[in-house]
From Swiss-Prot:
UniProt keyword annotation of tRNA processing present: yes
Designated name of the protein: tRNA dimethylallyltransferase
Organism: Streptococcus pneumoniae serotype 4 (strain ATCC BAA-334 / TIGR4)
UniProt-listed GO biological process terms: tRNA modification
One of the Pfam families matching this protein, by short name: IPPT
Length: 294
């Protein structure tokens, strides 16, 4: 029997953390961060981690598990998330995955029991190799492999190519989880206003000092490549004014949010909820209750 989990995704600044905490309180759950940057110790403001008070109210996992000089991959996330979810389930609680790193969450949900000779790491590496291809290029690869995909989309194409590449050993495996995937969204103008406002609040909370610490200690590590830090480095080098760097950060974050939505829309089977609609949280909680009772 597959383990039921709740997955909350969506663009940055849309309210994933707040909803995850509410769901955890309502359904006796624990939150697993699905964010590639929140794993790093010391990067708190720019990654929008749950506050210490929020983490004290509801257990959070996969936050502050790496130093800024260490690397972190989709394979690391899947391996650690699987162990974390198993522990939550064994405690009789509900695992709630919340985050915006689509590749990590998709890899977790499409992770397979591999009893044959194909390690999960190889599958993730192959999947990552397909990411740069456009839809047209993927369709060409599918045709070359002699595969047929009704109602073509990226997720189906990549899955079919994985099966063709690794063979029946992969095709016959079952996924580990039964997920309910909720994707939060907002009207574009409203979302962009939320992003701009959150960046302003981050500066008030000390983002500049946090980014300067990263710039002084490890400007070239993987942790420094995330949105929220590298956009401020030109200011530290004297190449931009603070106002210019702030606007650059807001623009980069808005573009990132757009890419996130495209990912979730095209590559994952999600239920969309507009956060600006009346009663949306009650509808989400009702859907979760029905899912868990089914």
């Amino acid at each position: 029997m597959k383990t039921k989990i709740i997955v909350i995704v969506g663009p940055t600044a849309v309210g994933k953390t707040a909803l995850a905490i509410e769901v955890a309180k309502r359904f006796n759950g624990e939150v697993v961060s699905g964010d590639s940057q929140q794993v790093y110790r010391g990067l708190d403001i720019g990654t929008a981690k749950a506050s210490p008070e929020e983490q004290a109210a509801v257990p959070h996992h996969l936050i502050d598990v790496r130093e800024i000089t260490e690397s972190y991959s989709a394979f690391d996330f899947v391996s650690e998330a699987k162990m974390t979810i198993e522990g939550i389930h064994n405690r009789g609680k509900l695992a709630i995955i919340a985050g915006g790193t689509g590749l990590y969450i998709q890899s977790l949900l499409e992770g397979y029991h591999l009893g044959g000779e194909t390690p999960h790491e190889e599958i993730l590496a192959y999947r990552a190799s397909l990411e740069p291809y456009s839809d047209e290029e993927l369709a060409h690869l599918v045709d070359q492999a002699g595969l047929e995909i009704p109602q073509f989309n990226r997720r189906r194409a990549m899955r079919a190519l994985e099966i063709a590449h690794f063979g029946q050993d992969l095709e016959n495996q079952e996924t580990l989880y039964e997920p309910l995937i909720i994707c939060l969204d907002d009207e574009r103008s409203q979302l962009y206003e939320r992003i701009n406002h959150r960046v302003d609040l981050m500066f008030e909370a000390g983002l500049l000092d946090e980014a300067k610490w990263l710039f002084d200690h490890s400007p070239n590590v993987q942790a420094a490549k995330g949105i929220g830090y590298k956009e401020l480095f030109p200011y530290f080098r004297g190449e931009q004014t603070l106002e210019e760097a702030s606007e650059s950060l807001k623009q980069a974050t808005r573009r990132f949010a757009k890419r996130q939505l495209t990912w979730f829309r095209n590559r994952m089977q999600v239920t969309f909820y507009q956060i600006g609609e009346s009663g949306v949280q009650d509808r989400i909680l009702s859907q979760i209750e029905e899912f868990l009772d089914d």
